[in-house]
Amino acid sequence: MADNKVNLSINGQSKVPPGFRFHPTEEELLHYYLRKKVNSQKIDLDVIREVDLNKLEPWDIQEECRIGSTPQNDWYFFSHKDKKYPTGTRTNRATVAGFWKATGRDKIICSCVRRIGLRKTLVFYKGRAPHGQKSDWIMHEYRLDDTPMSNGYADVVTEDPMSYNEEGWVVCRVFRKKNYQKIDDCPKITLSSLPDDTEEEKGPTFHNTQNVTGLDHVLLYMDRTGSNICMPESQTTTQHQDDVLFMQLPSLETPKSESPVDQSFLTPSKLDFSPVQEKITERPVCSNWASLDRLVAWQLNNGHHNPCHRKSFDEEEENGDTMMQRWDLHWNNDDNVDLWSSFTESSSSLDPLLHLSV
């Protein structure tokens, strides 16, 4: 091959056998192909061609260095070692579209615990230095180790060191980085496209009372009042606002109730909130949660007017403390507003727990 070009086809047919793959190891590239090339020895199957790295782009190399007709993931070629710029000592690896930039440290290649060469990794950047754009093209440049051996081996390169450094050969392997994706190509996720999970996780609020029952309001109100035990005085204003909202809620209804409960007592204009604001920090809270659980469970399970259940509940109340002591929801001053008493007076015909109020 005097023209230094690899022609693997004769009359349109490949010279290599079908299924031929060229996948040499690093040791084979250095110890066989590159060493024979440096020593001008004949290579049995000369499939690696010579390439001027400054005249070919990475995407052109895969066409020039193709071996056979089978698909390839990497391409091999010989190139001049450390070709310098005309007016300097820096290695010239620039092409028309970009440049090859070395990255990292050189890796030592060994054979049988013996150093035979080095591998340099380079990345192709599009544009001009130092503002090039990194691409997915990678090149491994293999060169023989021209350091004098001190272990007595005889196969040291016999050429002039200066001539070898300036006019030597390297064997290169070019490939594309796997799973390479640009950040600009990734789909952008906006906040508007995300599902609104926060709204679904929120519990019922006082501003949306259409799908919330009166019992839910009572439970939520009791839970908030129970937390006043550890609440500082600076948060009493917020608690007072919750109390006002609670007064505007619809009253409880029994399952058999067909007529709405009179809500005239819930009108904000007829309520005087000044005692509530004055006594907000002195109001006792519900501390017996066991009694509250029993009361709620009884109302849910025994909401119908069942004389047997009512009688058993009355007997249980007579044997224990009064519900006034268990709940501690009434205020000591009779002149102040009693929310629970007003609630029971208005729903006396519907509330099965009327006898529990004092």
Swiss-Prot record:
Domain notes: The NAC domain includes a DNA-binding domain and a dimerization domain.
Subcellular location: Nucleus
Broad class of the protein's primary localization: nucleus
Entry's transmembrane regions: none
One Gene Ontology CC term in the entry: nucleus
Expressing tissues: Stems and roots, specifically in interfascicular fibers (sclerenchyma), cells differentiating into vascular vessels (cambium), and xylem.
GO terms, molecular function: DNA-binding transcription factor activity; sequence-specific DNA binding; transcription cis-regulatory region binding
BP-aspect Gene Ontology terms: fruit dehiscence; plant-type secondary cell wall biogenesis; positive regulation of DNA-templated transcription
Protein name: NAC domain-containing protein 12
InterPro entries linked: NAC-dom (IPR003441), NAC_dom_sf (IPR036093)
Entry keywords, A to Z: Activator, DNA-binding, Nucleus, Transcription, Transcription regulation
Domain NAC: 16-177
DNA-binding stretch(es), residue numbering of this chain: 116-183
UniProt function note: Transcriptional activator of genes involved in biosynthesis of secondary walls. Together with NST1, required for the secondary cell wall thickening and lignification of sclerenchymatous fibers and secondary xylem vessels (tracheary elements). Seems to repress the secondary cell wall thickening of xylary fibers. May also regulate the secondary cell wall lignification of other tissues. Binds to and activates the promoter of MYB46.
